[in-house]
Amino acid sequence: MNKYMSVNVIFAKFSRDYMATKKYLPIRPSEMGVLNILTRCEGDFTPMKLAETLGVSKPMVTAHINVLLKKGYVREEPSPDDKRSFYVRPTEKAIALADEAEAKQTEYIKAVEERLGEKDFAALTELMEKAQVVLGEMIDR
């Protein structure tokens, strides 16, 4: 196997295993991404601002919001400035789930850091970020 195929296999295994750490979630990881923004970032978020923050389309965010509304994780609050617009607000249920998810993900990531050591973990983080930037620039968003 050549080095590029080896890296491809490693990336695939890492992606699979990382996604497996989120199997306990009662919602999809992409929907959890919306909740993370709403519960961990300051400010008011409209669907458009959520889409921009996440780097995805507004229709995709709208679909996520609709699911989260039905499941009781978010509520809509009319904008006082623009009657056509609304803010998406997390519910207490969303905050509780975000807290639980953060604790579990931190546990997994700390385990990786403990196994690698502080220096290798920092290097891994830096290299993964660089690789993500390159891939992000190459794919059609």
PLM region descriptions:
Residues M1, K119-R141:
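C-terminal regulatory/oligomerization modules of transcriptional regulators
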Residues R16-M60:
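N-terminal helix-turn-helix DNA-binding core of bacterial DNA-binding proteins
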Residues V67-E126:
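Charged, amphipathic alpha-helical coiled-coil/dimerization segments
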